[in-house]
Amino acid sequence: MKEIIEELQAKIDAIMEDKSQKLNRGLKLYNDVNNNESMIRWSKEDYDMFIDYFDVINHPIVKKHRKEHKKLTPRTLTFLLLCSMGKSDEDIRQIMALSPEGLRSMRFRLNHDSD
């Protein structure tokens, strides 16, 4: 029984360490966004870590967006989170490396999705 408990504790510790590293990375990405740094080199995992971190610091906003829009990609949810952070269209375009048409298209798809 003691061996099972030790094994489970080791698994819990490994999961906690992994989650801690991901949240730390999410914090770094969040700070980058606050400084209007570009996401152009972000991987899908980076988007996921940013969203996970944002969910920890502002769960109601993430929950609201997920409820209002059923088919959110990590990139689209990140766009909504940037809007929630009060970023201007120009800032969002710079951060997400979007053209004016790309920004319009994203807004159109989101408005169409929420109908």
Indicate where each model-derived feature is located.
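General nucleic-acid-binding
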Residues: M1-Y53
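Cytosolic nucleotide-binding catalytic cores of signal-transduction proteins
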Residues: N35, I40-D115
